[in-house]
Swiss-Prot record:
This is DNA-binding protein Fis. It comes from the Bacteria. Pfam families: HTH_8. It comes from Proteus vulgaris. SUPFAM superfamilies: Homeodomain-like. GO terms for biological process: regulation of DNA-templated transcription. GO terms for molecular function: sequence-specific DNA binding. Belongs to the transcriptional regulatory Fis family. Keywords: Activator, DNA-binding, Transcription, Transcription regulation. InterPro entries: Fis_DNA-bd, Homeodomain-like_sf, HTH_Fis, Trans_regulatory_Fis. Residues 74-93 bind DNA. Homodimer.
Amino acid sequence: MFEQRVNSDVLTVATVNSQDQVTQKPLRDSVKQALKNYFAQLNGQDVNDLYELVLAEVEQPLLDMVMQYTRGNQTRAAQMMGINRGTLRKKLK
């Protein structure tokens, strides 16, 4: 049997190539590619609040999945995320 080890320091994204092989790449590589695509579509236009845009795209799925993983346990979710439970509650509203 294959043993799958999880490196808790690196988030990965599974991708399927043209030969139907599944590969893992760091999430940061996917973020870089998404930003390259975004900048290419700007055609020289100025952009404001890019930091907020990226955080909004990442934060909500993070909250959703952590809450699902902890089965709604806010204390455990806050501990997993390394934030105060009160902060988590505000973000969930």
